[in-house]
Design a protein with these regions (language model features):
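N-terminal binding-site loop/beta-alpha segment at the start of enzyme catalytic domains
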Residues: 1-84, 150
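N-terminal small/glycine-rich loop or linker at the start of catalytic domains
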Residues: 16-34, 87-100, 123, 128
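N-terminal, well-ordered alpha-helical segments
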Residues: 44-47, 70-74, 88, 106, ...
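Active-site loop signature of alpha/beta-hydrolase-fold enzymes
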Residues: 62-65, 93, 134
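Glycine/proline-rich, positively charged
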Residues: 95-151
């Protein structure tokens, strides 16, 4: 368990990729829920989390219909990007479009691009599949995710 600076936060390896994440993270669902209400309060929460040494911030495209990604991204831009580990997720529909759901290659590529724009970053450190997609072959999902890693 590595510590950094003179903070009390503990960091652990994220798998075997070399990245370390704080043992505590800040999640978009608990922060924003189904809507983005009081941005000033959320800004204070995120600032306090960052100052406490939390470096892991998790969000999803579906939270508050994309507004949670926009709000968290706008707040996180106040901090050095290299000190953040940002994740998002996909699976659930964010529109009425028939292909805006699941884990198909098409949806993965389009969803990550929209998330990057909403969050206001060039890359995500982690991109999660929010759940298993029984309609898409696992091989297609894995290949599409691997393509993202190699971009």
């Amino acid at each position: 368990m590595a510590k950094t600076d003179d903070r009390e936060m503990t960091y652990r390896p994220l798998g075997r990729c070399g990245t370390k994440v704080s043992v505590f993270g800040l999640g978009g669902w608990t922060t924003f829920g189904g809507s983005v209400r009081n941005r000033a309060a959320v800004r204070g929460i995120i600032r306090a989390a960052f100052e406490a040494g939390i470096n892991f911030y998790d969000i999803a495209d579906v939270y508050a219909d994309g507004e949670a990604e926009r709000a968290m991204g706008a707040i996180l831009r106040a901090f050095p990007r290299h000190k953040l580990v940002i994740s998002s997720k996909l699976y659930f529909p964010c529109s009425g479009d028939i292909n805006d759901r699941g884990l198909s290659r098409k949806h993965i590529r389009e969803s990550v691009e929209r998330s990057l724009k909403r969050i206001g970053t060039d890359y995500l450190d982690i991109y999660f599949c929010h759940r298993f997609d029984k309609e898409t072959p696992l091989e297609e999902t894995v290949r599409a995710m691997d393509d993202l890693v190699h971009q």
